[in-house]
């Protein structure tokens, strides 16, 4: 280092020193990214292995599969590329082809698992009773197997048979990619056919499915929230009327205005949740797959259309892999997993949770509105049943909604079973985990 510092006057030493500093910063950043990906997904897997109740929910099967694919990205893909980035060349020789296959397989599996989760959540709230009957552990394993099988088929077979490589246009291009890298950097030119077809399967088709499913989820959730809000207004209205009647002044009986604001707040929370899910995924992967389809069309003339700098390409490659570090936060950070993480990390007693005031509005067999309130730790789940924030009873299936719109909207009270209770937790965020199917008696299946 001293020699470098004393030789900066000629310019060469300054370049070397800057390059060394850049490599150190790159190493630190990539190490943190890899460690965070390992920690987050390892915690998800360990929590599922340690706690049986996490394995009892079919939805968590897809979260586990997602965590496994992201964990493989952190083990089989990211470290090797990080070493190559720091060293400036690929030091692992013939392991290159296997690494490329692992890269395509793990990344595709992660994206397909995200797509399966979106379909699972849409089915759960659009047809809750059919979902309860059809979405068995066997059905979940079949969907997961399809996602992983497809990931293997578009990765190992084409790579090992060299179907993914573009044919060199000249003898000098035999070991050079469209990004201007030699085989020492373990980068090979993709053929146009493979680049487009693999991008369609790995990203464009799944992202289209996710956009459709999450858009429909929001529309269903919006209708549910508005109907729940109507129920709340009717319940509070009845309570106010009972109170004023007891005071001898039954004329003053008004509708609460705050219920409209709460309905808007809940709709906003659902929209924010779904926006984060789609926004993070698209921001991480879309730039890479756009470039992935552009690079094979890189021209050889003076203008060289669709050609990009290798550093730019690598940056967006890491952007895509960074999605694996964010998935545990987005998909496995509900109350069940948070409590499991706290127990595994030994901070359950050191991090006491705050309490929320929970108001329960229920309707007994006589049709009377009954109010009760209690306190529960923030993020806790009732032992009797899971909290229902988006009630499939109030929405029904998509077919029921169409019939109802044609024949007139029934009163929200008529949509409720006598034993159904609506849990109102105004401080709790809306997440996909809270969109759950329920049975005929208004309870979650055990």
Swiss-Prot record:
Lipidation sites, kind S-palmitoyl cysteine, are 347, 351
Cross-referenced InterPro entries: Dopamine_D1_rcpt, Dopamine_rcpt, GPCR_Rhodpsn, GPCR_Rhodpsn_7TM
Question: In which compartments does the protein localize?
Answer: Cell membrane; Endoplasmic reticulum membrane; Cell projection, Cilium membrane; Cell projection, Dendrite
**Regions crossing the membrane:** 24-49, 61-87, 97-119, 139-163, 193-218, 273-299, 313-337
Q: Which UniProt keywords apply?
A: Cell membrane, Cell projection, Disulfide bond, Endoplasmic reticulum, G-protein coupled receptor, Glycoprotein, Lipoprotein, Membrane, Palmitate, Receptor, Synapse, Transducer, Transmembrane, Transmembrane helix
**Which residues bear sugar attachments?**
5
Q: Mention any one GO cellular component term assigned to this protein in its UniProt record.
A: plasma membrane
Topology of this chain in the membrane: Multi-pass membrane protein
Q: Name one GO biological process term.
A: G protein-coupled dopamine receptor signaling pathway
Family named by the database record: Belongs to the G-protein coupled receptor 1 family.
**The name this protein goes by in its record:** D(1A) dopamine receptor
Give the source species: Sus scrofa (Pig)
């Amino acid at each position: 280092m001293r020699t470098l510092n004393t030789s900066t006057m000629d310019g060469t030493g300054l370049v070397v020193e800057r390059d060394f500093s850049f490599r150190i910063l790159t190493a630190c950043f990539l190490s943190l990214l890899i460690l965070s990906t390992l920690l987050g997904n390892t915690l998800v897997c360990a929590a599922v292995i340690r706690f049986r109740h996490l394995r009892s929910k079919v939805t968590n099967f897809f979260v586990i599969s997602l965590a496994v694919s992201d964990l493989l990205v952190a083990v089989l893909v990211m470290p090797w590329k990080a070493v190559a980035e720091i060293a400036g060349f690929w030091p692992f020789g013939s392991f290159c082809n296997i690494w490329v296959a692992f890269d395509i397989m793990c990344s595709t599996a992660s994206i397909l698992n995200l797509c399966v989760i979106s379909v699972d959540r849409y089915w759960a709230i659009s047809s809750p009773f059919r979902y309860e009957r059809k979405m068995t552990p066997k059905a979940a394993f079949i969907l997961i197997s399809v996602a992983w099988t497809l990931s293997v088929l578009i990765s190992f077979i084409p790579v090992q048979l060299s179907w993914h490589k573009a044919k060199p246009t000249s003898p000098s291009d035999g070991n050079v990619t469209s990004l201007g890298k030699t085989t020492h950097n373990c980068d090979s030119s993709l053929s146009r056919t493979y680049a487009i077809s693999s991008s369609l399967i790995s990203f464009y088709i799944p992202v289209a499915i996710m956009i459709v499913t999450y858009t429909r989820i929001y529309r269903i959730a919006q209708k549910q929230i508005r109907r729940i809000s109507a129920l709340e207004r009717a319940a509070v209205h009845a309570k106010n009327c009972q109170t004023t009647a007891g005071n001898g002044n039954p004329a003053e009986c008004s509708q609460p205005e705050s219920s409209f604001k709460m309905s808007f707040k809940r709709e906003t929370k659902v929209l924010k949740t779904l926006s984060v899910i789609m926004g993070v995924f698209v921001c991480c992967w879309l730039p890479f797959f756009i470039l992935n389809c552009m690079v094979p069309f890189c021209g050889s003339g003076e203008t060289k259309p669709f050609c990009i700098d290798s550093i730019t390409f690598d940056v967006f490659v890491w952007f895509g892999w960074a999605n694996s570090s964010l998935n545990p936060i987005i998909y496995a950070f509900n109350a069940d997993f948070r409590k499991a993480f706290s127990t595994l990390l030994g901070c359950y007693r050191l991090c006491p949770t705050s309490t929320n005031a929970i108001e329960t509005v229920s309707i007994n067999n006589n049709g009377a509105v009954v109010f009760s309130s209690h306190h529960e730790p923030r993020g806790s789940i009732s032992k009797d049943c899971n909290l229902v924030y988006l009630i499939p009873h109030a929405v029904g299936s998509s077919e029921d909604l169409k019939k109802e719109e044609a024949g007139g909207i029934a009163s929200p009270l008529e949509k409720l079973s006598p034993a159904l209770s609506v849990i109102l937790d105004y401080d709790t965020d809306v997440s996909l985990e809270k969109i759950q199917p329920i049975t005929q008696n208004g309870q979650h299946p055990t």
